[in-house]
Amino acid sequence: MSADSPRRHPSGVVGSGIGLGSGSGTGLGSGSTGGSKSGAAVPAIVPPQTVSDRSILDSAIGFINDVTLANQPVQDPKDTITWARFETCADVSDPRFGDDWELEGNAAPPLLLILGYGLGVQVWAIPANGEAVEVLSWRHGVVTALRVLPTPATAAALDENGRADEPVDSFAEKRPLVAFVDGGSAAASGLLAGSSGLGLGGGGGGVTTVGGSVGGVSGIGVSASAQFSAVNFMSLKTGVQVKTIKFKNAVLDIQANRSAVVITFHERIAVFDARTLEDRLTITTCYPSPGINPNPIALGPRWLAYAEHKLLHSKRSGGGCDGEGVPSYTATVLNAAKSLSKGLREFGEQVAAGLTGTTAGSGASSKSSSFDSASGGPDAKQSGVVTIIDVKHPVKDYSPTSGTPLSSTAGSQGGGDPIVAHFVAHSEALVAMEFDSSGMLLLTADRRGHDFHVFRVQPHPVGPSLAAVHHLYVLHRGDTSAKVQHIAFSLDSRWAAVSTLRGTTHVFPITPYGGAMGVRTHTSLHVVNKLSRFHRSAGLGADGRSSSPISHSESTTFVQSLQPYHNPTLPPYPRPSVVQPLAQLRQPFTLGSPPGSAGLGGGVGGGGVMGSGVSAGGHGVGVGVGSNSQRQRQRLSSLSDDSGKPLSVCSIFAKSRSWLLEPPMATREQPHRVQRKAVDSLFVMAGHGALIQYDLDTKLASHVAKEKICDDTPIELEVEARAQWNLGRRKDGSQEIAPPLGLDNWLIKDRHASLLLDSANQFDDPDERTESWLAQVEIITHAGPHRRLWMGPQFVFKNYNTPSGSNLNHVDAEAVEIGVSKTTTTTLPSTAASSALGLGTIIGKDRSSPLNMPLSAATSVGGAGIGSSAVTGRSGAGVPVLIESGSYSSIEQSPKLMDRFRHGHLDSDYGHGDTRLKEDLADAMRESPSTAAARRETTGNYFTTDQLDGLALNNNNNINNNIIPTKDNASPNPNTNTNPNAIPSSNKVQKAEVTDAVDYPIRHSYGDHGELSTVVNIEVFDDQLSMSSISTNSRLSLEGPPSQSSPPLSLTNGLMDTNLMHFSESVTGTGVAQAQVHGRGANRFEVDDDDEEEEEEEEELDEEAEPDDDEREDRPLGRRNL
């Protein structure tokens, strides 16, 4: 423990009226009395109520009253809400753990809202049905902080192997626990005696801000601050205080996750183990904050972020905030006006002070100078620095920034350096920060409140110096100062809400990966990829530039351009985007509202709340980015943020809970609680005691024409105040609900049925446990593109000649050249059917010697012709036409996975995708003028697959397969089946067993005169699929005139139109080889058989054609060809 860390007294029951079990009874319930009260207490239930929009006149009157702070009703200080927070880490309210236990369907977990009063505390649960239930309430003592501690993660969850010295949960039988700071009777009397101290430093009372994420204010005198230096832990199940930890300094806030409990003080932070409540880490290098929270922190699922008092260059991470950016013209003018007015005011104060002999303004100047002095010596403090540490493993007696060595215990457990990142976030002092639900995004706010920064942390296992912090966004609130008191993220990290001290909540659109926002990113139900299908298929980066090695930018090297994903920890880092708020929701200061507002029955003041949530403007709730009226309204309301009365406001994104307000005759086929929207509702709780649900809906920007809508089209946000709950304390005085709580209470009911315990205790039946875990599941995170780049009309296919002996580059390596080599032909009898089909000979299967591809132009390489109708010439060099389809990730419904993991109910969808792909390929071919010329010469001697299916069966059976050796193949390969009766049916084509060889035989289809026409090859690699359309006869060239003796085969008609890349599971055709792609264990192309006897004969044929082991070993291992 550091020498200047807070002193901790021995744990136990404190007897001076502070603890729970004290004899004076001023604690939070004493002994059996509290239990008897909780058993007899009936929880209050508050249903949702509609929110009525105020008229323009009423809104104007309310705005004047809010600004002038006049006509405020006098309220009892002990019933005033001093702080509020939403509890998101408790077992019952954690959105990452299951649904509601009593509701069916996709029901959201209940919201847990904690309200701190002048005397006592109150906890509400708002389940998915919309009826708020009071789950905890007491009126004794001043509570400045309260947290419902989540159940700690078990050792099995922390480490799969487990460790013998892993601490166990010492309070497993007493959970759930609450941690709170209770002031006792002395603090209560101090509050009642000096209620004027409720302001920020007003009167004689000091300020103790509570909640790093809420920042509520409790008016406690300085003399009573020592009473708030103890943290008590109480069991809600038994009502017994299990532990008390006392410190020498006042406790500001308590935060907790499933591995640690964090307690903050002025310039200090203490971290305790969540299972044993023992010391884990002490931080004494915090920078003091000038905001409402003297020591702001952010606690995520694993990391803890806090404001550091000095920047250590040895631990500084890459990235961060390079500066505040270029100020706008309006901000420049306002800053100049402020500087001029400030100078004139100081000059006037100095003149007045010289005449009167006083020193006015010295206090304010000294206060500001204490935070502005960032330079002046080697030990001077620097503002705006953030340090993120890992609090998962025990790291005791270690100061992260002072460099104190780790103890042997921490080092043996793999603690290492706990610092994850160390960077500069702002140039001013930090006043608030918050992690998102994933713990990777961090939003920070400085004391001016003009801009909020969003960072994405990219850790490195070596240390913080190799980590990177990406500055994604600059959320611009306005050009006037404001104090931030609360920050909230949506569960999918696409929206952020920032609340200021005047009660205004600003809603910003963001993305987890940065970049521009638009229709594509914020109107879908799910988070989309950073690159759209258009960018990925066209090879464009996020900035719209080509990512090819030829046209790379200056900041992108050649090696980086070849990588599919850039290393996020290496520069260059992304530049931040400036984002304006899409909505600004303002809360009134009191419940006293003009006529026409919705009444809150039994509430304090008996009034309602402003329905629109906007300070002025009536029904103008849906605010776009370019709304000048909203910006002007925001500027007027924030001018007095620093001097006005504070209003405690907190917010949270959650599913809607207003379905009870739907008309009684409305259909319940799809209840509101299960309807999915692109953005969740926003719940805002203000100090007047009313919780308001705002329904958010995205729409297209109004200034964009319909014909110009694209993925990057800006959006607007429509806001509707849907429902409200009056959760303030009643005048009649409700009964206390103190521990021990009943089994039907939301805080403890059905805890053992949740997913928070060890996985071994979840299922009684081993079979049920096995079924719940999906093993060996392959996740496809990227969808295929909707088109290929080469399919556009701007591409024309031409002949590509490769001179013999020339050097080939990477692009040439993708070409497959077909020449006449060792082949075995099959002569078809001249029958009526063969003449009609245009099939004269079929080249049989043969294997050549292994060659390094593509040095020989006369050898078939890469499995050319397998699974395709290969129509080629007998002489001449290969003339390939390249068609490259891109990387494997761009394949639309990858045939590898599609055929291997095909399901019966998905056949129609895959078939539709195959048909569309063939149609797209045919359309792309028709754009070529050379193919159009060839199409005009096409005669009617060639049939499509559908036409072949319509032929008479007896005509189809007239075609026989015979093997006739040629001069190029005088000695056929013994592995080649030469039995003329091997395949008796004409609509059955010999199967080709696919192995990992480089060179493969070619399957050729001849016309009725034995002339070669064209060939289409389909090559499937481990990570890429490419196609080549090849013509090897000058008379059948795509650009040359067609032969009169043998009509050419057009790329857009006949066989090629229907058989190009056909991956269906069952296709019937005559004389046409259909390609079917299977997994690695069944790599074979086949033609569907309807006769079982013919299938058996084909299997025998495959066994005879299987190569020897010696022959397989001689082949070089290269790309896998299908």
Swiss-Prot record:
Pfam families per the UniProt record, alphabetical: BCAS3, BCAS3_WD40
Chain spans, region Disordered: 1-41, 357-382, 620-644, 966-990, 1033-1054, 1071-1122
GO cellular component: cytoplasm; cytosol
Annotated compartments: Cytoplasm
Biased composition (Low complexity): 357-377, 626-641, 966-987, 1036-1051
Coarse class of the protein's main subcellular location: cytoplasm
Domain remark in the UniProt entry: Has been proposed to contain 7 WD repeats. This prediction could not be reproduced.
Similarity field: Belongs to the BCAS3 family.
Name under which the protein is recorded: Breast carcinoma-amplified sequence 3 homolog
